[in-house]
Amino acid sequence: MISKRKKKSDTKVYALGQHIRMSAHKARRVIDQIRGRSYEETLMILELMPYRACYPIFKLVYSAAANASHNMGFNETSLVVSKAEVNEGTTVKKFKPRARGRSYPIKRPTCHITIVLEDTTVYDEYVISHDTYSSGGLWDKK
């Protein structure tokens, strides 16, 4: 049996962006592309994608990496986006004046974006442990 041994207990660093003025559905379209990728690959993807949601997500990933290097001392090349989620925020409601004294409501949705980066150097060391309770294989039993 192969098990993983962790060196440090805290390997995750996060950045949270709240009340970003964009639809959660449009931000999820970009977030789904970067989930599980390395930090450098994520920055490259976000710079080349043509969506408006890329810039605030780029700033959050960059901020999370700065938190990892400054607060925890992690190397930026070994960071991976382990968790990236988008939640709906409050809706900003306005009224648009129209003809003959009428008004139409305008709803501007907001979203909350959470980016979690994890250090992968912790999982470099593997430990092989043998199960002491098994007598061998399936064919040893009578």
From Swiss-Prot:
One GO CC annotation: large ribosomal subunit
Intracellular or extracellular location(s): Plastid, Chloroplast
Primary subcellular site in the record, as a coarse category: plastid
GO biological process: translation
Keywords: Chloroplast, Plastid, Ribonucleoprotein, Ribosomal protein, RNA-binding, rRNA-binding
Gene Ontology molecular function, alphabetical: rRNA binding; structural constituent of ribosome
Top-rank lineage group of the source organism: Eukaryota
Bilayer-spanning residue ranges: none
Assigned protein family: Belongs to the universal ribosomal protein uL22 family.
Subunit structure: Part of the 50S ribosomal subunit.
Function noted in UniProt: This protein binds specifically to 23S rRNA. The globular domain of the protein is located near the polypeptide exit tunnel on the outside of the subunit, while an extended beta-hairpin is found that lines the wall of the exit tunnel in the center of the 70S ribosome.
Protein name, entry field: Large ribosomal subunit protein uL22c
Organism: Carica papaya (Papaya)
Taxonomic lineage from the root: Eukaryota, Viridiplantae, Streptophyta, Embryophyta, Tracheophyta
Encoding gene (name): rpl22
